[in-house]
Amino acid sequence: PSYRDVIQLRAMDFTTTAVDAPALTGVRVPGEQLGGAEAFRRWVGSEVIPFLRDQYRVSEMTFVGHSFSALFGVHVLFESPSMFDHYLLASPSVWWDDQVMFRREQERYDSGQGLKAHVFMSKGELETDELSPHQDFHDQLASRNYEGLNLHWQVFPKETHLSVAPVALSHGLRTLHSTR
């Protein structure tokens, strides 16, 4: 597949709503090719996880995502938090669709639902909050005091949106799996 194909498939599976995507990656993706996160979540839950549990000895499941895939992780966290035991969300694209995930979190909170999950969120120091307000999203989650939510936050010095991924992966996995 071409670079364009990969970007389009990634955007389809990881975005939560079907709105026109800005050409941040150099590839413009029309809205009708977006918003497949819920279908992708159902497929992961009904096909991928059962396959993994059938084929391998799995005791814990950790979701790892960066950027759009971390946006998908936030969606899974709100829709079915018990799908994974741990969530590593590096630079989630919470800017998506005029910050729709802020509203989804507010709806979850207003409904009185809990949020039992172990979450590591992070961003690179050199990422601008205008593009993705990671700190604000973390602060909104942290302010709720959800029973059972174990939330970690890390800003990595001198890291950009792209360079933060490997650092967040290493640090996040150690953080999530050292608190058992």
Please tell me what each predicted stretch does.
Residues P1-R180:
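Non-catalytic cap/lid and distal C-terminal segments of serine-dependent acyl enzymes
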